[in-house]
């Protein structure tokens, strides 16, 4: 129990320290889009390495362009990374079961028609508003800081 409290306190402290890194502005649609400084595979590798280094559970990597190719459809490179911290993410779901539509965290890595690689995710403040969750501000702030830290490994 003491170790759990220590880890929780450490994660909160880390998130608050890194909050300025996660201060990316969401578009009106609630999507944060950031340019990657790297190619597609290096972006994916760097993100996955940072997720693992932070001790965050990695659930899945879905190569959407491969799925499209298997269906005979051409799609620019697009990969969805799914990860999260169940003790944190489930707190959002306990506030509103519909929040399960937005958890675990999904981070999209895609290449546009000019060859620029992007990372995109749903803004956590937008998720809170979408689900009317008003009693988890500390947790949303922490999640924002963590995703900002993760994406900072591929942005300049």
Segment roles from a protein language model:
Residues 41-44, 48, 65, 144-148:
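Extracytoplasmic/secreted envelope proteins and their assembly/folding machinery
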Residues 52-105, 109:
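Compact, glycine-rich, soluble single-domain proteins
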Residues 36-44, 61, 133-140:
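Solvent-exposed, acidic/flexible segments
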Residues 106-133:
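Beta-strand/loop substructures that line and gate deep hydrophobic ligand-binding cavities in soluble
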Residues 26-56, 153-156:
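Terminal, regulation- and interaction-focused segments at domain boundaries
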